[in-house]
């Protein structure tokens, strides 16, 4: 079921769970999540749960998409955001409506190709895609004043820290694959990096190397 009432119930739940950024909530309200999942799962698209998208990947839980987006924007608007892990393209689509430009890296080409098609369908034109190793980021276009990582790393990749602009913010899950991990907010400051642990999460692992 993809009715407006179903979407409104999801927005109400996100608000009750602590998402308070009105712009984030509005973007999630108007973005058709059912386009980002297989047709067989479309009836579950507005449940607050992660869903499989193939290739051992998932579309993230709406709360997590909202929460990570809100954290990224906590200090104000951003004009240049790097996304590690395009996946279904849902988080990408949300970001594209919240920031000026999104640069999205995905290692699984078939997923990225589908995500591109969905964003074109939604007329979101401010996203540039790269097929490659997310652990390496996208150094040629660095620095970024926001980085969002949608897969868990055992530790924060140094390459991503290096690509964060002064004052920039990174939201990333850190910890062992298949176990409870910690969501972290990292801010690049004059004397280094501040790190804030935001709570337990579970994400698929951030893997090396592109995959056709």
From Swiss-Prot:
Protein known as: Protein-L-isoaspartate O-methyltransferase
Alphabetical UniProt keywords: Cytoplasm, Methyltransferase, S-adenosyl-L-methionine, Transferase
Family of the protein in this entry: Belongs to the methyltransferase superfamily. L-isoaspartyl/D-aspartyl protein methyltransferase family.
Organism, as annotated: Pseudomonas entomophila (strain L48)
Disulfide pairings: none
Active site location: 60
EC number assigned by the record: 2.1.1.77
GO BP term (any one): protein repair
Keyword Transferase: yes
Functional note: Catalyzes the methyl esterification of L-isoaspartyl residues in peptides and proteins that result from spontaneous decomposition of normal L-aspartyl and L-asparaginyl residues. It plays a role in the repair and/or degradation of damaged proteins.
HAMAP family: PIMT
Xref: Pfam families: PCMT
Subcellular location: Cytoplasm
Main localization, broad class: cytoplasm
Reactions catalysed, as given in the entry: [protein]-L-isoaspartate + S-adenosyl-L-methionine = [protein]-L-isoaspartate alpha-methyl ester + S-adenosyl-L-homocysteine
InterPro entries for this protein: PCMT, SAM-dependent_MTases_sf
GO cellular component: cytoplasm
GO molecular function list: protein-L-isoaspartate (D-aspartate) O-methyltransferase activity
Keyword Transferase: yes
